[in-house]
Swiss-Prot record:
Annotated active site: D165 (proton donor), D186 (nucleophile)
Record-listed substrate binding positions: Q142, R246, W248
GO CC terms in record: extracellular region
Signal peptide span: 1-19
Pathway: Glycan metabolism; pectin degradation; 2-dehydro-3-deoxy-D-gluconate from pectin: step 1/5
Record-marked site positions (Transition state stabilizer): Q164
EC top class named in words: hydrolase
Purpose: Involved in maceration and soft-rotting of plant tissue.
Protein name: Probable pectinesterase A
Similarity field: Belongs to the pectinesterase family.
Keywords: Aspartyl esterase, Cell wall biogenesis/degradation, Glycoprotein, Hydrolase, Secreted, Signal
Amino acid sequence: MYLPSLVLGLLGFGLTASTSPIEERSNRSKAPAGCLTVGSSGTYATIGAALSALGSSTSDACIFIGAGTYQEQITIDYKGKLTMYGETTDTSSYKQNLVTITHSISSPEAGSLDKSATVNVRSDGFKMYNINVINGYGKGAQAVTLVANADKLGFYGCSFVGYQDTLYAKAGRQYYSNCYIEGAVDYIFGDASAWFGECDLVSVGPGYITAMSRTTADETTWYAIDHCNIYGKPGVDLTSAVYLGRPWRVLARVIFQNSQLSNIINPKGWSPMATGATPLYYEYNNKGAGADTSKREYESPISGAVSIATVLGGGWNSWVDTTY
């Protein structure tokens, strides 16, 4: 169901799906050329309807979503490369996003983690710009906001809000830039190789930021949190109540580097989870009240920052939007 915004009547929309060029950072109040359009003045009233209209094509495509709140649960399994744009007054950040996709269901109610997700991405090469995604279930059970289960995914200026298991970085290579990620318990988890650059990771309750599930030594997967801000939601006292992570599987591998760690981080830094785990947990060049490593547990030494090529592999700049 679509809940219109007052500004939608001012917008103009295109009609067809095709490739569109990377935009410069600016106001995005109308559809990039060639995009299918969603909203009160668009061709489609719901995001799901626009996705259905893409059909079985394998051509590159894009969808523009006009300002408003969309009460939907969507699966993105398009066979071509799809880009989804949200209306915003500032494309360089999540802070002025005008589009929200929201749904509320827990994993036990839905039957699985994937089925609880507000947005479930299964399409290789998918990109999302300036869209807020929420699972409003709250405390009490796992309830996923985003399942990212494909290769070469990019999320730019997006916001992901949940409580337990917000962002399921499940598999493939993934890039998150200037995003907002909110939760309390294991709110970034899975076995993707994921780079989080210049993101805000915001805890709303005691718990664990990451729960990485690398299982075998030959897996090349990492979570790299680089130049990010880690803090608690204003008004919630979480002093020393949050851990950087715990290993969902035995060989979890995570680095926090070049980031600001607030006083929410417990001096121990990391916590146990999987039986017999020997995780690889690294910290490098972080600042702030939570960055003191003198009392850390489970931390491994490292001599320098991890590169994006290490995390995402060679050729990463052929699919990452390096202008963002």
